[in-house]
Amino acid sequence: MSRVGKLPITIPEGIKIGLNDLEVKISGPKGELSKTFKGNIAISLAENKLLVKPLAANKNARAMWGTARSIISNMVTGVKEGFKLKLEINGVGYRAMVKGKYLNLMLAKSHNTKIEIPSDIKIEVPKQNIIILEGTDKEKLGQFASIIIKQRPPEPYKGKGIKFENQFIPRKEGKKN
């Protein structure tokens, strides 16, 4: 029995939910999200609580049960409050700036890296070495953050690179002569 899946999702005021078989549409003050789930689960709405149940007793259905509940819970949180990720850029001469619908990264390469910003994600660069990402979809936000981090992942010797705000980078000792 899934400890996550059996918990009901409480729907706060101001959030509308539309259920159409296995498609869930959630709209709120920050926007609208929809997701279609595969079989093996049943989603029902009862007095401001959303319930997710497995249709079969097999391993796949039980795994999808908790996952679907977490995804729907994140959708509700996203349309109500939104999600925010903060990235730090460490390194001499490493900078970020927003130009139009592109994020321009200067990361000690022979060229500047331009990344197109998705329409549902807002980017703010308060300082040259801090990037703040905001959006309603937690999954898309994390994927976009990983695209940015991939441009220059943090390295363990000097700590240069792009990382999440409170991410710990284990440091290594350099060569000894």
From Swiss-Prot:
> From the Swiss-Prot or TrEMBL record, what is one GO molecular function term?
structural constituent of ribosome
Domain of life of the native organism: Bacteria
Is the keyword Amino-acid biosynthesis assigned to this protein? no
- Which InterPro entries does this one have? Ribosomal_uL6-like (IPR000702), Ribosomal_uL6-like_a/b-dom_sf (IPR036789), Ribosomal_uL6_a/b-dom (IPR020040), Ribosomal_uL6_bac-type (IPR019906), Ribosomal_uL6_CS (IPR002358)
Q: Which UniProt keywords apply?
A: Ribonucleoprotein, Ribosomal protein, RNA-binding, rRNA-binding
Asked if the record carries the keyword Cell inner membrane, the reply is no
Q: GO biological process annotations for this chain's record?
A: cytoplasmic translation
Q: Which Gene3D superfamilies match?
A: Ribosomal protein L6, alpha-beta domain
Q: Which Pfam families match?
A: Ribosomal_L6
Please give the GO cellular component terms listed in this UniProt entry: ribonucleoprotein complex; ribosome
Q: Which family does it belong to?
A: Belongs to the universal ribosomal protein uL6 family.
Q: Which HAMAP family match?
A: Ribosomal_uL6_B (MF_01365_B)
The role this protein plays is:
This protein binds to the 23S rRNA, and is important in its secondary structure. It is located near the subunit interface in the base of the L7/L12 stalk, and near the tRNA binding site of the peptidyltransferase center.
Subunit note: Part of the 50S ribosomal subunit.
**Name of the protein in question:** Large ribosomal subunit protein uL6
Native species: Rickettsia africae (strain ESF-5)
Organism lineage reads as: Bacteria, Pseudomonadati, Pseudomonadota, Alphaproteobacteria, Rickettsiales
